[in-house]
């Protein structure tokens, strides 16, 4: 995954006069222009916060991070709690809520699920545009009465995931969770929309083996890798076992038992 979307032309756009100052702030932070001829993407600032819009006649709708409404809220309320496969994969059990580093945070969906179940989460998203969407979503979540206690358990870190893990300071995370980009073939509208938008920006993860190696060196208890169900394991040490779902699976690399 490249950190800078070299092949894409990106502008920052205010969706109204009242958002110009904030748009200028994001443009300065990300080193992006406010107007760009023939832009491929527009990072838009408006009443719903920050959103990324692909431009062009066949472009999907905008993508934003929203922990208060929509899919995140539905999963928080009705998603199955600690019985969810991701909860089992990271080792959530009675009296066990591990400290988890999500080193491929993306839009923060999986990290939010784990935080809603009581895990203290650290998140790394190395693609600056996606990191900006995540930062904005966390800030808006902190303003919501019900969501604020959850996002308070989510700390966003900046930088290259591999470098951050190799140079980690302080107590290591008990569990490291990885979901590297892979050539997804799912047909759902949501996956198609997000993958169509993100793939030109982030590509796949050719350095997934180095990501796994850094995670295995840092995690104190286990590493969990989410993969499409029929995808090969990441090159390197083999997982001890896997939890299989309908469209994805979780490869488990245990180091030490998680105990209450």
Swiss-Prot record:
Q: Which reaction does it catalyse?
A: guanosine(1516) in 16S rRNA + S-adenosyl-L-methionine = N(2)-methylguanosine(1516) in 16S rRNA + S-adenosyl-L-homocysteine + H(+)
Q: Name one Pfam family in it.
A: SAM_MT
Question: GO terms for molecular function, please?
Answer: rRNA (guanine-N2-)-methyltransferase activity
For bias type Basic and acidic residues, the affected ranges are 241-254
Give its localization: Cytoplasm
InterPro entries associated with the record: 16SrRNA_methylTrfase_J, SAM-dependent_MTases_sf
Q: Does the keyword NAD apply?
A: no
Which parts of the sequence are annotated with region: Disordered?
234-260
Residues binding S-adenosyl-L-methionine: 125-126, 179
EC number(s) per entry? 2.1.1.242
Q: Which Gene3D superfamilies match?
A: Vaccinia Virus protein VP39
| UniProt enzyme class | transferase
Main function = Specifically methylates the guanosine in position 1516 of 16S rRNA.
Family, as annotated: Belongs to the methyltransferase superfamily. RsmJ family.
Among HAMAP family, the record links this protein to: 16SrRNA_methyltr_J (MF_01523)
Could you identify this protein by its name? Ribosomal RNA small subunit methyltransferase J
Q: Which organism is it from?
A: Pseudomonas fluorescens (strain SBW25)
Name of the encoding gene: rsmJ
């Amino acid at each position: 995954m490249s950190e800078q979307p070299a092949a894409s032309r990106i502008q920052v756009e205010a969706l109204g006069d009242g958002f110009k100052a904030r748009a200028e702030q994001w443009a300065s932070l990300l080193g992006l222009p406010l107007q760009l001829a023939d832009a491929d993407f527009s990072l838009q600032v408006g009443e719903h916060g920050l959103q990324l819009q692909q431009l062009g006649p066949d472009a999907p709708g905008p993508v934003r991070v929203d922990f208060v409404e929509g899919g995140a809220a539905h999963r928080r309320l009705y998603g199955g709690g600690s019985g969810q496969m991701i909860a089992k994969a990271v080792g959530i059990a009675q009296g066990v809520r591990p400290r988890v580093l999500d080193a491929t945070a993306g839009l923060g969906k999986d990290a939010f699920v784990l935080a809603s179940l009581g895990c203290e989460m650290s998140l790394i998203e190395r693609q600056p545009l996606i990191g900006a969407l995540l930062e904005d979503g966390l800030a808006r979540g902190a303003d919501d009465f019900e969501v604020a206690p959850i996002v308070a358990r989510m700390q966003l870190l900046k930088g290259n995931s591999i470098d951050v893990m190799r140079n980690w300071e302080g107590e290591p995370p008990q569990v490291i969770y990885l979901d590297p980009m892979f050539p997804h073939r799912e047909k759902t509208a949501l996956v198609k929309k997000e993958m169509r938008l993100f793939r030109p920006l982030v590509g796949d993860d050719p350095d997934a083996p180095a990501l796994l190696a850094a995670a295995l060196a840092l995690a104190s208890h286990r590493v969990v890798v989410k993969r499409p169900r029929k995808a090969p394991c990441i090159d390197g040490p083999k997982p001890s076992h896997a939890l299989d779902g309908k469209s994805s699976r979780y490869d488990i690399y245990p180091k030490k038992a998680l105990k209450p």
